[in-house]
Amino acid sequence: MNDNRHRSKPPASLAPRDLAALIDISAVQAFHTEADVRELAEIAVAEGFIAAHALPNFVPLLRSLVPPGGPTLVGGPVGFPSGGHTTRMKIAEASELAEGGAQELDMMINVGRLKSGDIGYVRSEIRAVVEAIAPVPLKVILELAHLTDEEIRTASAIVAESGAAFVKTGTGWTPSATTLERLKLIAVTVEGAVEIKAAGGIRSLDAIAEMLRLGVTRFGINTQVAVDLVRQCAALPGSRLDIAGKAD
Protein backbone atom coordinates (compact mmCIF):
# COMPACT_ATOMS: atom_id res chain seq x y z
CA MET A 1 0.00 0.00 0.00
CA ASN A 2 1.20 3.50 -0.85
CA ASP A 3 1.88 5.40 2.37
CA ASN A 4 3.70 8.35 0.72
CA ARG A 5 6.62 7.89 3.08
CA HIS A 6 9.18 9.04 0.50
CA ARG A 7 7.44 12.14 -0.83
CA SER A 8 9.40 14.75 1.14
CA LYS A 9 10.64 17.62 -0.98
CA PRO A 10 14.32 17.72 -1.93
CA PRO A 11 16.54 20.23 -0.13
CA ALA A 12 16.84 23.72 -1.61
CA SER A 13 20.56 23.15 -2.16
CA LEU A 14 23.32 20.61 -1.58
CA ALA A 15 26.86 20.99 -0.28
CA PRO A 16 29.51 18.66 -1.77
CA ARG A 17 29.26 16.20 1.12
CA ASP A 18 25.46 16.20 0.84
CA LEU A 19 25.77 15.36 -2.85
CA ALA A 20 28.24 12.53 -2.18
CA ALA A 21 25.78 11.12 0.34
CA LEU A 22 23.29 10.53 -2.50
CA ILE A 23 25.70 8.71 -4.84
CA ASP A 24 26.54 5.01 -5.18
CA ILE A 25 29.77 4.14 -6.96
CA SER A 26 30.67 0.67 -8.16
CA ALA A 27 33.08 -1.77 -9.75
CA VAL A 28 30.61 -4.23 -11.25
CA GLN A 29 31.82 -4.67 -14.80
CA ALA A 30 33.15 -8.10 -15.79
CA PHE A 31 36.70 -6.77 -16.17
CA HIS A 32 36.99 -5.16 -12.73
CA THR A 33 39.87 -6.58 -10.69
CA GLU A 34 40.83 -6.78 -7.02
CA ALA A 35 42.90 -3.63 -7.51
CA ASP A 36 39.81 -1.85 -8.85
CA VAL A 37 37.81 -2.90 -5.80
CA ARG A 38 40.52 -1.64 -3.46
CA GLU A 39 40.58 1.68 -5.29
CA LEU A 40 36.77 1.82 -5.16
CA ALA A 41 36.80 1.42 -1.38
CA GLU A 42 39.47 4.07 -0.96
CA ILE A 43 37.58 6.61 -3.07
CA ALA A 44 34.20 5.84 -1.50
CA VAL A 45 35.49 6.35 2.03
CA ALA A 46 37.57 9.43 1.20
CA GLU A 47 34.73 11.17 -0.63
CA GLY A 48 31.90 10.06 1.65
CA PHE A 49 29.84 8.35 -1.06
CA ILE A 50 26.84 6.62 0.46
CA ALA A 51 27.60 3.20 -1.02
CA ALA A 52 30.19 1.18 -2.91
CA HIS A 53 29.16 -1.92 -4.85
CA ALA A 54 31.29 -4.78 -6.16
CA LEU A 55 30.56 -8.03 -7.98
CA PRO A 56 29.52 -10.84 -5.59
CA ASN A 57 32.90 -12.55 -5.28
CA PHE A 58 34.51 -9.26 -4.24
CA VAL A 59 31.89 -8.20 -1.67
CA PRO A 60 33.73 -9.78 1.31
CA LEU A 61 36.91 -7.95 0.29
CA LEU A 62 35.04 -4.67 -0.09
CA ARG A 63 33.39 -5.21 3.30
CA SER A 64 36.85 -5.62 4.88
CA LEU A 65 38.07 -2.36 3.31
CA VAL A 66 35.18 -0.09 4.29
CA PRO A 67 35.19 0.90 7.98
CA PRO A 68 32.08 -0.29 9.83
CA GLY A 69 29.84 2.40 11.23
CA GLY A 70 30.95 4.99 8.68
CA PRO A 71 28.86 6.79 6.07
CA THR A 72 29.68 4.34 3.26
CA LEU A 73 27.61 1.19 2.84
CA VAL A 74 28.78 -1.96 1.06
CA GLY A 75 26.55 -3.46 -1.60
CA GLY A 76 26.44 -6.00 -4.37
CA PRO A 77 24.25 -7.13 -7.28
CA VAL A 78 21.82 -10.04 -7.43
CA GLY A 79 20.76 -11.82 -10.63
CA PHE A 80 23.13 -9.53 -12.45
CA PRO A 81 23.10 -8.33 -15.14
CA SER A 82 20.38 -10.26 -17.03
CA GLY A 83 17.85 -11.01 -14.29
CA GLY A 84 17.17 -14.40 -15.84
CA HIS A 85 18.21 -16.47 -12.82
CA THR A 86 15.61 -18.61 -11.08
CA THR A 87 14.03 -17.26 -7.91
CA ARG A 88 15.85 -19.87 -5.82
CA MET A 89 19.16 -18.77 -7.33
CA LYS A 90 18.43 -15.13 -6.53
CA ILE A 91 17.44 -15.97 -2.96
CA ALA A 92 20.62 -18.00 -2.47
CA GLU A 93 22.83 -15.31 -3.96
CA ALA A 94 21.19 -12.50 -2.00
CA SER A 95 21.33 -14.47 1.24
CA GLU A 96 25.02 -15.28 0.81
CA LEU A 97 25.83 -11.63 0.10
CA ALA A 98 23.84 -10.42 3.10
CA GLU A 99 25.52 -12.99 5.35
CA GLY A 100 28.89 -11.89 3.92
CA GLY A 101 28.41 -8.30 5.01
CA ALA A 102 26.50 -6.60 2.20
CA GLN A 103 24.42 -3.78 3.67
CA GLU A 104 22.20 -3.28 0.62
CA LEU A 105 21.61 -5.24 -2.57
CA ASP A 106 20.59 -4.31 -6.12
CA MET A 107 18.62 -7.07 -7.85
CA MET A 108 17.85 -7.26 -11.55
CA ILE A 109 14.17 -7.86 -12.28
CA ASN A 110 13.27 -10.81 -14.53
CA VAL A 111 12.74 -8.83 -17.73
CA GLY A 112 11.75 -11.86 -19.78
CA ARG A 113 8.98 -12.81 -17.37
CA LEU A 114 7.79 -9.20 -17.19
CA LYS A 115 7.64 -8.87 -20.98
CA SER A 116 5.83 -12.23 -21.16
CA GLY A 117 3.10 -10.82 -18.95
CA ASP A 118 3.91 -13.15 -16.05
CA ILE A 119 3.27 -10.48 -13.43
CA GLY A 120 2.64 -12.97 -10.64
CA TYR A 121 6.09 -14.49 -11.10
CA VAL A 122 7.81 -11.10 -11.04
CA ARG A 123 5.89 -9.96 -7.97
CA SER A 124 6.42 -13.14 -5.97
CA GLU A 125 10.13 -13.25 -6.81
CA ILE A 126 10.77 -9.73 -5.54
CA ARG A 127 8.80 -10.38 -2.37
CA ALA A 128 10.66 -13.65 -1.78
CA VAL A 129 14.06 -11.97 -1.98
CA VAL A 130 12.93 -9.04 0.19
CA GLU A 131 11.81 -11.50 2.86
CA ALA A 132 14.95 -13.64 2.58
CA ILE A 133 17.37 -10.79 3.28
CA ALA A 134 15.34 -8.59 5.64
CA PRO A 135 16.30 -6.16 7.12
CA VAL A 136 18.92 -5.61 4.38
CA PRO A 137 17.30 -3.21 1.87
CA LEU A 138 16.73 -4.33 -1.71
CA LYS A 139 16.84 -2.12 -4.79
CA VAL A 140 15.06 -3.59 -7.82
CA ILE A 141 16.60 -2.79 -11.21
CA LEU A 142 14.21 -2.41 -14.16
CA GLU A 143 16.71 -1.89 -17.02
CA LEU A 144 14.57 0.70 -18.78
CA ALA A 145 16.35 0.24 -22.11
CA HIS A 146 14.53 -3.08 -22.55
CA LEU A 147 11.05 -1.88 -21.53
CA THR A 148 8.14 -0.04 -23.11
CA ASP A 149 6.50 2.82 -21.23
CA GLU A 150 3.63 0.55 -20.18
CA GLU A 151 6.06 -2.10 -18.95
CA ILE A 152 7.87 0.57 -16.92
CA ARG A 153 4.57 1.52 -15.28
CA THR A 154 3.74 -2.11 -14.56
CA ALA A 155 7.17 -2.94 -13.15
CA SER A 156 7.26 0.22 -11.04
CA ALA A 157 3.87 -0.60 -9.54
CA ILE A 158 5.03 -4.12 -8.69
CA VAL A 159 8.16 -2.83 -6.95
CA ALA A 160 6.17 -0.19 -5.07
CA GLU A 161 4.03 -2.84 -3.39
CA SER A 162 6.76 -5.46 -2.91
CA GLY A 163 8.51 -4.22 0.22
CA ALA A 164 11.66 -3.28 -1.70
CA ALA A 165 13.45 -0.10 -0.68
CA PHE A 166 14.11 1.33 -4.16
CA VAL A 167 13.17 1.03 -7.79
CA LYS A 168 16.31 1.51 -9.90
CA THR A 169 16.46 2.47 -13.56
CA GLY A 170 19.32 0.36 -14.91
CA THR A 171 22.43 -1.76 -14.44
CA GLY A 172 24.89 0.45 -16.28
CA TRP A 173 25.50 -2.44 -18.69
CA THR A 174 23.41 -0.92 -21.49
CA PRO A 175 24.40 2.17 -23.50
CA SER A 176 21.09 3.99 -22.97
CA ALA A 177 21.07 6.91 -20.54
CA THR A 178 18.30 7.44 -17.99
CA THR A 179 15.90 10.11 -19.29
CA LEU A 180 13.73 12.56 -17.39
CA GLU A 181 10.65 11.41 -19.30
CA ARG A 182 11.04 7.82 -18.14
CA LEU A 183 11.87 8.89 -14.60
CA LYS A 184 8.59 10.81 -14.57
CA LEU A 185 6.77 7.59 -15.50
CA ILE A 186 8.29 5.88 -12.49
CA ALA A 187 7.69 8.78 -10.11
CA VAL A 188 4.04 9.19 -11.11
CA THR A 189 3.47 5.45 -10.77
CA VAL A 190 5.09 4.83 -7.38
CA GLU A 191 3.82 8.09 -5.84
CA GLY A 192 6.45 8.00 -3.11
CA ALA A 193 5.73 4.43 -1.97
CA VAL A 194 9.31 3.42 -2.78
CA GLU A 195 12.49 5.42 -3.31
CA ILE A 196 13.94 5.95 -6.79
CA LYS A 197 17.54 5.35 -7.80
CA ALA A 198 18.61 6.77 -11.16
CA ALA A 199 21.58 5.11 -12.85
CA GLY A 200 23.02 5.27 -16.33
CA GLY A 201 24.49 8.20 -18.22
CA ILE A 202 24.20 10.77 -15.41
CA ARG A 203 27.04 13.19 -16.07
CA SER A 204 26.01 16.70 -15.02
CA LEU A 205 24.94 18.63 -11.94
CA ASP A 206 21.99 20.01 -13.90
CA ALA A 207 20.74 16.47 -14.54
CA ILE A 208 21.08 15.62 -10.85
CA ALA A 209 19.13 18.73 -9.83
CA GLU A 210 16.34 17.95 -12.31
CA MET A 211 16.13 14.35 -11.16
CA LEU A 212 16.01 15.34 -7.50
CA ARG A 213 13.07 17.60 -8.28
CA LEU A 214 11.31 14.60 -9.84
CA GLY A 215 11.74 12.61 -6.64
CA VAL A 216 14.98 10.69 -7.18
CA THR A 217 16.76 10.06 -3.88
CA ARG A 218 19.81 8.05 -4.96
CA PHE A 219 22.13 8.02 -7.96
CA GLY A 220 24.39 5.38 -9.46
CA ILE A 221 27.22 7.21 -11.19
CA ASN A 222 30.54 6.20 -12.74
CA THR A 223 33.23 6.59 -10.08
CA GLN A 224 35.38 9.18 -11.84
CA VAL A 225 32.34 11.13 -12.99
CA ALA A 226 31.00 11.10 -9.42
CA VAL A 227 34.27 12.48 -8.07
CA ASP A 228 34.29 15.17 -10.76
CA LEU A 229 30.69 16.17 -9.98
CA VAL A 230 31.47 16.57 -6.28
CA ARG A 231 34.44 18.76 -7.24
CA GLN A 232 32.21 20.81 -9.55
CA CYS A 233 29.73 21.28 -6.72
CA ALA A 234 32.51 22.57 -4.47
CA ALA A 235 33.45 25.12 -7.14
CA LEU A 236 29.93 26.59 -7.38
CA PRO A 237 29.06 29.91 -5.68
CA GLY A 238 28.79 29.20 -1.98
CA SER A 239 29.92 25.63 -2.73
CA ARG A 240 26.28 24.56 -3.05
CA LEU A 241 24.24 23.02 -5.85
CA ASP A 242 20.89 24.78 -6.28
CA ILE A 243 18.04 22.28 -6.32
CA ALA A 244 15.05 24.60 -5.79
CA GLY A 245 15.21 25.77 -9.42
CA LYS A 246 12.20 25.83 -11.70
CA ALA A 247 9.50 23.38 -10.72
CA ASP A 248 8.16 21.01 -13.38
From Swiss-Prot:
Please indicate if the UniProt record lists tRNA-binding as a keyword.
no
The record lists the catalysed reaction(s) as: 2-deoxy-D-ribose 5-phosphate = D-glyceraldehyde 3-phosphate + acetaldehyde
UniProt keywords, alphabetically: Cytoplasm, Lyase, Schiff base
Key word Cytoplasm present: yes
Q: Which family does it belong to?
A: Belongs to the DeoC/FbaB aldolase family. DeoC type 1 subfamily.
Briefly state the protein's biological role: Catalyzes a reversible aldol reaction between acetaldehyde and D-glyceraldehyde 3-phosphate to generate 2-deoxy-D-ribose 5-phosphate.
Its protein name is: Deoxyribose-phosphate aldolase
